[in-house]
Amino acid sequence: MTAPALSATAPAERCAHPGADLGAAVHAVGQTLAAGGLVPPDEAGTTARHLVRLAVRYGNSPFTPLEEARHDLGVDRDAFRRLLALFGQVPELRTAVETGPAGAYWKNTLLPLEQRGVFDAALARKPVFPYSVGLYPGPTCMFRCHFCVRVTGARYDPSALDAGNAMFRSVIDEIPAGNPSAMYFSGGLEPLTNPGLGSLAAHATDHGLRPTVYTNSFALTERTLERQPGLWGLHAIRTSLYGLNDEEYEQTTGKKAAFRRVRENLRRFQQLRAERESPINLGFAYIVLPGRASRLLDLVDFIADLNDAGQGRTIDFVNIREDYSGRDDGKLPQEERAELQEALNAFEERVRERTPGLHIDYGYALNSLRTGADAELLRIKPATMRPTAHPQVAVQVDLLGDVYLYREAGFPDLDGATRYIAGRVTPDTSLTEVVRDFVERGGEVAAVDGDEYFMDGFDQVVTARLNQLERDAADGWEEARGFLR
């Protein structure tokens, strides 16, 4: 196959990547500026260098305050304001940022939320219905994963199921039209331990939603599907994999023969999905543990085996993440980084050979690492947590109706987590009212050491973005805050 000819602006579109030809990028941008009459010809070179430096900066470090970027360029405020205006007139530079090493932050989270206006609402402390609502319907879990923050043995009383499921249906009814991905089922505890999950999924589908369930699939048996036919109305089932054999599963979950059962459940689900011609998507979340990067090849073989069982229906997606637990600086050692890069290259080659239609989501840090950048996971500490959190962006609701401000706080009996409950949904109090009351009364939580573990990656990104936007506004850059909008 002949490669397409590179356009004159291609160097600019790639300028944020490690090893990019920055000289060629500056030349291309300078030509664009001069040809379009955007700057005088004698200023095109200097202006282009500044613009390319901005693209490199925000393509790698998306949470940089504007004032910091201005100081880095060494220009005054008027000159910087002109540069920001010019940046928006060179689409190739925006492409460079969105496809750079930090592109997953921009495309997966920041820009979609900007376009919905939820950051504006959070900064203005305006009560709006959350952009994302996680329903945590599971009363218990059959695993005891060593990394899970769940208190051993903690569970919800089964007597809470009927009232809890009625409450969940009322929350689903509140979700505004226009955002079909606004709600998902997760935990907390295992969603499939709730015998009413299928009914809730069907109710969500009837409401115009496309919900995903995050599950370990241990209970995704044919009998469960027969008892809960509404599960077939889900948009997707995302199974968290805790290994690729029984030994690895037992080390992680504490349960014998768990992998074997999950694998057989998924094989049978593949067969049933094909027989029913169901549009439901099936995929995985897989964490690459230290020293196990080579297991990515076995992951592809595992998926290929499931494809064989699907009679033409193949696994739709896999989300790959690196284990950053215990890394306070959010960085990987150089040796481990090199090992992981090599493993990812081999993984992608095996995917092309055996599972060519598989969609792969590498998340934030691994996306950077794949480009050759020095991957560093964002870390929010108690000092930078926002007392007001961000209920306009996301909340989580457990079986009791408690509305949690962070995704990893929604576990029963978890020490300190109740401080992050904004309120409770009841027959007399809607989710809309809980959020409105929390925001309007100026609800705040003073973070203490360890509270950062109540936040997942999404919460951390949202917090970093809000801190950045607030800093930009305070520095007098309200009209350009956040760089890209």
Curated annotation (Swiss-Prot):
InterPro entries: Aldolase_TIM, DesII, Radical_SAM_PqqE_MftC-like, rSAM. It catalyses: dTDP-4-amino-4,6-dideoxy-alpha-D-glucose + AH2 + S-adenosyl-L-methionine = dTDP-3-dehydro-4,6-dideoxy-alpha-D-glucose + 5'-deoxyadenosine + L-methionine + A + NH4(+) + H(+). One of its GO terms (biological process) is macrolide biosynthetic process. Its cofactor is [4Fe-4S] cluster. [4Fe-4S] cluster binds at C141, C145, C148. The reaction starts by the transfer of an electron from the [4Fe-4S] cluster to S-adenosyl-L-methionine, spliting it into methionine and the radical 5-deoxyadenosin-5'-yl, which attacks the sugar substrate. Belongs to the radical SAM superfamily. DesII family. Involved in the biosynthesis of dTDP-alpha-D-desosamine, a sugar found in several bacterial macrolide antibiotics. Catalyzes the SAM-dependent deamination of dTDP-4-amino-4,6-deoxyglucose (dTDP-viosamine) to yield dTDP-3-keto-4,6-deoxyglucose. It can also catalyze the oxidative dehydrogenation of the non-physiological substrate dTDP-D-quinovose to dTDP-3-keto-6-deoxy-d-glucose. It can also deaminate dTDP-3-amino-3,6-deoxyglucose. This is dTDP-4-amino-4,6-dideoxy-D-glucose ammonia-lyase. The lineage of its organism: Bacteria, Bacillati, Actinomycetota, Actinomycetes, Kitasatosporales.
